[in-house]
Structure formats: C-alpha cells, structure tokens
C-alpha cells in the first residue's frame, strides 16, 4: 500500500476549515487504496487527538514567538521525520515557500513526489519586519514554488488557471462526506413564520465577510431574523463599530463547536455569504458555501471565487450583485410563500456535487 503524508497548519479533527479540507481529501485517498497520515499544528498539545477517522495524527507546536515562527515557516518539520514515514507522496497544505523548497529537494532525492494543496492567496498587511517576511514568502510561494511541484490541488478555478500550464494541476473545491449524519439531510424541510438567516464565520482578516453590510440591510425587515455565529456583539462592534440604533432582529450567539454550528445552519432558511471581489476571495473557495448546500440551506451570496458555477439565482439561493442588491433580495424573500422556500431547500438537497467521492477521477490524475 502506497503512503501519503499530509503536512500543514490544520487542527484535527475539525477545529478549522483546513482540517475539514484535508480530512475529506484523506478519505478519498484512503478509498483509493492509500495509507494517509497527518502532521498538523496545534495550540493545545495536551488535547490534540492522536487519531482522526482512523488516520494517525502528529503535530508541531504553533509558534509563540518570532524565533519559533521563523522556524515554522522555514522548516515546519524536519526532513528526517518526513523520511521516517517512508511516504510515496507528500502533500503540503498552504505551505511556506522556504519549507516547501527544502522538502521538495529532499523528497526528490528519495523518489518521493510532492503535491501542494493550495486553498488561498494570502495577503500580508503593513510593513513590519514580520509582514515584510510574509510578503516575500507569499510571493515566492505563489509565483515560484507552486510551479515546481509535482502536482497542485487547486481549490478554485482562479488558482487552477494560475498553475495548469506549469504542473499537473487538478481543480478540487472543498468537499465533504455527504453520508455524515451531522448534515441531517433526511430531516423534514420546513420554514417558520419568521425567516431565519444565519451568518456562521469569523469575519476573517481584512473583514472578508461583510457582516456590517448584511446587518445594515436586514435591520429594516422585522419579519427576518439574522443569527450570528462565530462572534459576539462586543467583538462585532470592535471590528465594525456600534450596532445600528433600533436594530432588534439580529442575535449574536458567539462561538459554537463545529457540530453545533452545522446544526444551526440546518435550522436556518438561508445562509449569508457577502464578500468583496478581492484577490483573496477570488483565489479561495468558501467552505461555508459547501456546508450550507450540504445542510440543504440555500445561500444569499455575492459571486466570489467560482461559486457562480453552483449558485443559481432563485433556484438554490440568491445572487447579490450590481443588478440585485441585498435589500432587493430581502424584499423578494418576504414575498415568497413557505412552499417556495422549501423547494429551494430541496434543490440544495438534490445537489450532491461536493461529496468527495465525485472527485476520484481527478485525484487519479496525480495519485497512482
């Protein structure tokens, strides 16, 4: 049995979107006959799991100071430890440039193929010494290192187009296991008297999610309630300023465990995904889009990344653009009857394109 070693800043088993991404890929590789193991990062080694879904998990400590951070981005883990696993393939998840090149050099000397799973184009703000180092690293990674890899797993069409002419590149959006009961896909699809919207996320660096825009629009629709998961009102006001006066239909629920957040999405009528058309958003692909579809919950979204390949206005959600503002979408929703909304939920349920099993043929282009 051939071995795959997955390296990167993921926190197993489901503490971040990175962990969910690599786990779905690992499940597919396992079904293809590969033995997969992980070396991720952790901020809490005492509670880090040694095994997730049957896959062995090891960790490096998340850096706490400048010295540790420099080692993290230039080495991550020793090449001796990598070779001790005797892998046939090493997959690097959003890996720093210098560490990538070191691993690539040693791996090629030992007949190991190196694949890069790339899910974002990071942005480093400011001009502090650390920010300058990050800018250099990001530039090297995206414009040089990626093209040297034996293969690239690109999360978005934007990244796929960047590297398809330079290496063996496959397009794999965020994927999930549709048989997992957390999606609760066999429940009765219903809608209540008050339309339930949900924002589930952390806003992100650079405020990639425009939660303030959503709140400004929803405040004038008392028959719509917005539930915010991932931050509390205090955190929101630190980022965006005070809540609008008289806004009574927004409820902040703070951070929740992943499974509880997924249940909240299942219990909602629409999920909100409003983002700018920035380089970062074009290069990535929102995991919450995939999760919402899997939960049978339609989306109200701007067309960041290539989600336009999947989102159909009025069918499985609503598109917000220059022709249809968020206010216009909310006006459409309050004019809908429950049957129409349930039909949209059913359309989401009928779509199974994000199940990881659909991408076996693509994976076989790299992993043989």
Task: Show where each model-derived region lies.
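N-terminal strand-loop element at the rim of the active site
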Residues: 12-13, 28-70, 81, 159-162, ...
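A charged, aromatic-enriched C-terminal amphipathic alpha-helix characteristic of glycosyltransferases
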Residues: 17, 324, 339-367
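Nucleotide-sugar-dependent
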Residues: 17, 205-209, 259-264, 271-291, ...
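Conserved catalytic-core segment of nucleotide-activated headgroup transferases in glycan assembly
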Residues: 21-24, 178, 183, 193-241, ...
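Membrane-proximal helix-turn-helix segments that form the acceptor-binding/catalytic region
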Residues: 24-27, 73, 77-80, 98-100, ...
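Donor nucleotide-sugar binding/catalytic pocket of nucleotide-sugar-dependent glycosyltransferases
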Residues: 40, 58, 142-184, 190-192, ...
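A short alpha->beta transition loop at the rim of the catalytic pocket in nucleotide-sugar-dependent
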Residues: 269, 296-297
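Conserved acidic donor-binding segment of nucleotide-sugar-dependent glycosyltransferases
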Residues: 313-324, 332-338
